[in-house]
Amino acid sequence: QYLCREGEIIKDPSLDIPNFRKSRYLPRILSEIETEKLITAPDLSSAIGIRDRTMLEVLYASGLRTSELLNLRYSEVNLQQAVVKVFGKGAKERIVPLGMEATAWLKKYYEESRQELLKNISSDLVFVSSRGRQMTRQNFWHIVKKYARLVGIDAAISPHTIRHCFATHLLNHNADLRVVQSLLGHSSISTTQIYTHVATTRLKNIHSCHHPRG
């Protein structure tokens, strides 16, 4: 392409290479049953277990990016209306519903666990580490991997997988693509459309496995 622009050659030879353009990556998606197993894996007898369960509930209910979840502050959470105010890429603000289940877990975490984790440290962050500090992306990645292994999910799972599940499961239940785009904070609908391909692929797999002539 550079040589073409500079006038050194007439035609870009890379155009003759089959499938030169990289195909779009289809993300790994957990089934709804697998997602439920992952979310309910934490041991609720400890403050850390309640925190982890709450983080997984909020992540699946809202589809937040990992950075958005870890930077979430209580001043941005409205438990009465069950919504969070999120500042995403480019500092774009959006309002995301939490649903009843995630809201209930946030209340439980706040009332029963958060103060124990804070250890007298003052912080407006919703989720903190076992030392009362801000949790790192790597910390949360290890948490998700730990629970995935615990419930027998061997695939390459990360916190972002749960965001993928959020979008795909909504579309599987006939959510409008534009609404999903808004919830995810995508600036372009083409970014969101990848999930329609994932949903279609899953439907084809189900058909092929269960239909007598599949």
List PLM regions with ranges.
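Conserved catalytic core of the tyrosine transesterase superfamily
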Residues: 1-214
